[in-house]
Regions:
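Conserved beta strand-loop-helix elements of the APE1-like EEP
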Residues: 48-50, 64-81, 180-196, 225
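A short, structured active-site edge motif that brings together acidic residues
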Residues: 52-65, 82-87
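Metal-dependent phosphoester-hydrolase catalytic domains
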Residues: 85, 118, 122, 129-143, ...
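Surface-exposed cleft-lining segments at the edges of enzyme active sites
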Residues: 1-4, 31-32, 82-88, 111-120
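Beta-strand-turn-beta hairpins that frame and shape the catalytic cleft
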Residues: 68, 74-80, 92-109, 225
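Residue-level marker for buried hydrophobic side chains located in beta-strands
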Residues: 26, 143-144
Length: 225
């Protein structure tokens, strides 16, 4: 996510997230200690720019002298946090699920395989199994957000919606950010967990802080509950 189009865009993205007054952020395609990013622990650095936020990073695979993975960062401190390796299967790369349990909700993120729908389905099954077993009876709403690399109407999207309700708008594209034509990023809630009132949802294309197309190749998706 960071440094894809412009060098050292951490502050730009932090300013954008502060602009929308975010409380929790799911982040995909993070580097940790890689050569290409000059050995920065990207999520830790970003969380510090947000004001010493709590965070959890999960490494999906070794990459370029360091690691590559996903993460969640939150304004409040988590009561529990962990990551779970997801099956690569016939997909292109290993993937990971990252979870942060807060006092009153649970939020997790993943980035499904970008090549194989078969691999995506295996990854979805383990994500759902993990979150149901750990939090299905927790009395807390459970949210999953990230790059699913699949539209809601795809086979992967349909499998997700058996157990997850999509809460964000899906009628507009999220990728690519400069000409969004596919909705492959969304935020969902695990069915059977306490219902939340959705105040609003947006796919964010314009910020006062800067050009979102220079910050990421995906548009950020916001959910207000």
């Amino acid at each position: 996510i960071f440094n894809k189009y412009i060098k050292d865009d951490y502050q730009l993205i932090a300013d954008m997230m502060k602009e929308i007054d975010a409380d929790a952020i799911c982040m995909n395609e993070l580097d940790n200690n890689t050569n290409r990013t000059r050995h920065v622990y990207q999520l830790k650095h970003f969380a510090s720019l947000m004001g010493s936020w709590d965070f959890e990073y999960g490494a999906a695979m070794p990459y370029d002298g360091g690691e590559y993975g996903e993460g969640v960062t939150t304004r409040k401190k988590a009561v529990n946090k962990f990551s779970v390796a997801l099956p690569k299967g016939v997909g292109a790369e290993p993937r990971v699920l990252v979870v942060m349990e807060m006092e009153d909700y649970v939020i997790c993120t993943s980035h499904l395989d970008h090549v194989s729908s078969e691999a995506q389905l295996e990854q979805v099954e383990l994500i759902t199994k993990t979150m149901k077993e750990r939090y299905g009876d927790s009395g807390k709403p459970v949210f999953l957000g990230g790059d699913m690399n699949a539209t809601p109407s795809s086979e992967t999207g349909k499998l997700l919606q058996k157990d997850w309700e999509i809460l964000t708008i899906t009628g507009f594209g999220t990728f690519p950010s400069d000409n969004p034509s596919k909705c492959i990023d969304y935020i969902m809630q695990l069915k059977g967990t306490p219902k939340c009132e959705v105040v609003g949802s947006q796919i964010l294309r314009w910020f006062k802080s800067g050009d979102v197309t220079k910050a990421s190749d995906h548009l950020p998706v916001m959910l207000d509950i």
